[in-house]
């Protein structure tokens, strides 16, 4: 993911948590915040230490980033997203993780996601 598509700073995460709306399924919680002045979407990832050691957490983050890269044309621009991974993600394959991510994005009201 390019730098323009990332949320890195703590205050940006907090803004999305406090002002954004959340949608969840068993594997993910997605917070989204509209930012019309922004030309593209931005994603922040959070994987708790409860999920596993650093190897497991980084694997989950890599799979989420790859899914986002494949879905980038279908994700609404002008929004900030914070994706929080839950415990079941640790045992999922890439295909299952991507399918679950698409499901939670659809639940959040994104109409352009078709896969």
From Swiss-Prot:
Its EC number is 3.1.26.5. It holds the Pfam family Ribonuclease_P. One of its GO terms (biological process) is tRNA 5'-leader removal. InterPro entries: Ribosomal_Su5_D2-typ_SF, Ribsml_uS5_D2-typ_fold_subgr, RNase_P, RNase_P_CS. One of its GO terms (cellular component) is ribonuclease P complex. It is an enzyme of class 3 (hydrolase). One of its GO terms (molecular function) is ribonuclease P activity. It catalyses: Endonucleolytic cleavage of RNA, removing 5'-extranucleotides from tRNA precursor. RNaseP catalyzes the removal of the 5'-leader sequence from pre-tRNA to produce the mature 5'-terminus. It can also cleave other RNA substrates such as 4.5S RNA. The protein component plays an auxiliary but essential role in vivo by binding to the 5'-leader sequence and broadening the substrate specificity of the ribozyme. Consists of a catalytic RNA component (M1 or rnpB) and a protein subunit. Belongs to the RnpA family. This is Ribonuclease P protein component. The gene is rnpA.
């Amino acid at each position: 993911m390019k730098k323009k598509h990332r949320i890195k700073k703590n205050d940006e995460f907090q803004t999305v948590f406090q002002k954004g709306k959340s949608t969840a399924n068993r594997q993910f919680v997605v917070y989204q915040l509209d930012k019309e002045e922004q030309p593209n979407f931005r994603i922040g990832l959070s994987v708790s230490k409860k999920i596993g050691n650093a190897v497991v957490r980084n694997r989950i983050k890599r799979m989420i980033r790859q899914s986002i890269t494949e879905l980038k044309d279908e994700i609404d621009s002008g929004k900030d997203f914070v994706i929080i991974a839950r415990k079941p993600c640790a045992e999922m394959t890439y295909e299952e993780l991507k399918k679950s991510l698409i499901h939670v994005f659809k639940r959040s009201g994104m109409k352009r996601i078709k896969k």
